[in-house]
Amino acid sequence: MFKKTKPRISILALTISCAIYSGAALAQDAANSNKFWWPEQLNLSPLRQHGVESNPMGSTFNYAQAFKKLDLNAVKADIKALMTQSQDWWPADYGHYGPFFIRMAWHSAGTYRIYDGRGGAGGGQQRFEPLNSWPDNVNLDRARRLLWPIKQKYGSSISWADLMVLTGNVALESMGFKTFGFAGGRQDDWEADTVYWGPEKKWLDDKRYSGDRTLEKPLAAVQMGLIYVNPEGPNGVPDPLLAAKDIRDTFGRMAMNDEETVALIAGGHTFGKAHGAHKPETCLGKEPAAAGIEEQGLGWTNKCGKGNAEDTITSGLEGAWSVNPIAWTTQYLDNLFAFEWVQVRSPAGAVQWIPKDGQAANLVPDAHDKTKRHAPIMFTTDLALKEDPEYRKISLRFKENPKEFELAFAKAWFKLTHRDMGPRVRYLGNEVPGEILLWQDPVPEVDHPLIDAADITKLKSSLLSSGLSSAELVRTAWAAAASFRGTDLRGGANGARIRLAPQNTWAVNNPRELNRALTRLEKVQGDFNKASTGGKKVSLADVIVLGGVAAVEQAAKKAGYAVEVPFIPGRTDASQAQTDVTSFAVLEPTADGFRNYYAKDNTLPPTDMLVERANLLTLTVPEMTVLVGGLRVLGANSDAAKNGIFTDKPGTLSNDFFINLLDMSTQWRKSAKTGGLYEGLDRKTGKLKWTATPVDLIFGSHSELRAVAEVYAANDGQEKFVNDFVKAWHKVMMLDRFDW
């Protein structure tokens, strides 16, 4: 029996081998996507990512509760011990993994960008393609493998996303630096995020620039596969002043000002070294995503020398900045200004800089051989801190005031690693700093009794008799809540920032109407608070949302349905002093298909921008569909235009939008008068019935959206439409309620 089994195993192995290596077999199995055949077709896949189906923890797992039970001190002790437990398969530089883990944490968080809130440490996306295989992330696969025993030990109690950031903090602390704090609460993703990283088809290309080196929005890196800038200079041109421009642009797009930028670069380059022992094109294998299955998720296998230690290849630059690369010092800044720097090339051929005339040739110890010493190095981007006038002022101030430098780096590091976490209420753990920072978009805590059911009923009545139409109430509530971004958890109705700069001047919010509406809503709030007893109050933020609730309930009643739209009080009102105008400016929607708004300077079509807005609001395809249909009949267009209002009874929560959109008695054509608009004509008489935008018509044109629209247009679809709209409306109103 044993002899009979053996050849069968061999045959099975041969079969598997053929399946793996036969390109023809794979080609036969792989079907071309619809996008291949129809590249202009609207892509709805962003609205289907990160579903519960891909999450092995299931929908009932509560990460926050699991993290709260974690002994964070024990985790940190294990991480600290790991720092000096050098492994033969990946020896630690200078006997300490600290600098390696700082780079891992930095590159995990450093993908964040302000224009769409994508990137950042949340989700632990560094584990997935494309980030796990970016040229700028060479060898960080090893950093995560070094951490695996700790992740394995604590399991689901700490996410990869939190662990990578925490490890960066412990790395700093283990080398003598006092961090500003740490907050947990980052849940892991289980699949690669759908993110536009740039138009390039090759690594390190830079087709993202136009004109006089204008970087395409929302991108925040100079080349495909880099976190920020090219350390050798723009496109490898070793010009520190040109590099300074790239640094200021990219770090600014990551929400960092000049002082924070200098602190991060100078602080980060205090530690560790760059690796360029050999030419990567000669020595390195394929990146993790392209490596063989036997590599088990690792990549960049180095066939030169030992393949690690003194033969390590990462960026291609080679050397350390300071004399003691595993301790917090001011040596980076001291060296930067102490020497005149000249160009040389690393063993890998990369341009870098060393002190002129052989100065300090033996200043820096070797990372692995105690008998060797080297000159300190600088990147072109390091010299930018010396050559750029503003960066130079800050760098010299930090050099002369070490304590100020230390605090600046601590705060900038905390901001770097926590920028995408949203408000402080999401922060978990006993190391959350007590200081409230402006970039956290703070809102006051509730310091008064909240309104109850009787109060809510009374306020609804006051709102409906305030002189505002139901459409105005809906528009104001939507404008407040729909500023939310699920990417970095900013925006939303809480704080009532819609009454503050810059939101009160956004074109999409129709400032003149908004001012009128807010005046009426503030009167309702003021009258209630003046008449209330026992210290009970209602915030303007709650009044704004409640106005939308009252209007939706009234509209449903007109349609014949008595529904109660959920409402949970507890929002508070932020002040202008708590609102960074520049920081909030990037949240301004240049398109909002739910309000049929589309600014002329957009580069993407209105339908793509609708999907983008729905994605930022964390909506599904059905939720997007029902909200558009409902908001149209409620008259929620930003400028009160009639486009897409396919009903003869506006203000009634009917399914008329879908019924009339799918009505074959209407023939659609492009408007000859107004670009971007369509006219719906009676097929028999040619009489104009409706006008529409592409966002309206896509629900009848796109096969998947039409399938959903048909559900709501059916004879039995009205009640489902009302219930689904109410549920989706409530979801949007609550997106920023992390306190609930």
From Swiss-Prot:
GO terms for biological process: cellular response to hydrogen peroxide; hydrogen peroxide catabolic process. There is a cross-link at Y228-M254 (Tryptophyl-tyrosyl-methioninium (Tyr-Met) (with W-106)). Binds 1 heme b (iron(II)-protoporphyrin IX) group per dimer. Formation of the three residue Trp-Tyr-Met cross-link is important for the catalase, but not the peroxidase activity of the enzyme. The active site is at H107. Keywords: Heme, Hydrogen peroxide, Iron, Metal-binding, Oxidoreductase, Peroxidase, Signal. Heme b binds at H269. It catalyses: H2O2 + AH2 = A + 2 H2O; 2 H2O2 = O2 + 2 H2O. There is a cross-link at W106-Y228 (Tryptophyl-tyrosyl-methioninium (Trp-Tyr) (with M-254)). It comes from Cellvibrio japonicus (strain Ueda107). The keyword Protein biosynthesis does not apply. InterPro entries: Catalase_peroxidase, Haem_peroxidase, Haem_peroxidase_sf, Peroxidases_AS, Peroxidases_heam-ligand_BS. Residues 1-27 form the signal peptide. NCBIfam families: cat_per_HPI, PRK15061.1. GO terms for molecular function: catalase activity; heme binding; metal ion binding. This is Catalase-peroxidase 2. Bifunctional enzyme with both catalase and broad-spectrum peroxidase activity. Gene3D superfamilies: 1.10.520.10, Peroxidase, domain 2. It is an enzyme of class 1 (oxidoreductase). Belongs to the peroxidase family. Peroxidase/catalase subfamily. Homodimer or homotetramer. Its cofactor is heme b. CDD domains: catalase_peroxidase_1, catalase_peroxidase_2. GO terms for cellular component: cytosol. Its EC number is 1.11.1.21. The record marks R103 as: Transition state stabilizer.
